[in-house]
Amino acid sequence: MSQLCPCGSAVEYSLCCHPYVSGEKVAPDPEHLMRSRYCAFVMKDADYLIKTWHPSCGAAALRAELMAGFAHTEWLGLTVFEHCWQDADNIGFVSFVARFTEGGKTGAIIERSRFLKENGQWYYIDGTRPQFGRNDPCPCGSGKKFKKCCGQ
């Protein structure tokens, strides 16, 4: 039986993010890279995460931290709510909510990730955490207020 991709695309993993995580293909744009990196977190694949971080970030030094995080975190879902890039600019952004449980507590990472394209490959550079008011609609698309959803 086929497994749906953890990235939330509703497509089989083998047809969605697996070709990127396995190295068969290079992610064609920042959104595909973001989704495949989320899958790597779900599947505890530190090698892919390090390979897709921009070389200037020194991600190899984060291997132990990544491995420790894998042991305590269960990823529950990804919602991409905004993306923008132009291949001519070689820079792109993807905004998302990644839900997880850690130590029995649920949480969410809300980030606007920045990506850079070099030599035909997109890399994750860094991210910022956008600020939402407690009464703003939650960016995950649930229809709830932020304070009653991902802002808890």
From Swiss-Prot:
Membrane-spanning parts: none
NCBIfam families named in the record: PRK01617.1 (NF002449), PRK01752.1 (NF002486)
Family according to the record: Belongs to the UPF0225 family.
HAMAP family assigned: UPF0225
Protein name: UPF0225 protein YchJ
Organism: Escherichia coli O7:K1 (strain IAI39 / ExPEC)
Upper taxonomic lineage: Bacteria, Pseudomonadati, Pseudomonadota, Gammaproteobacteria, Enterobacterales
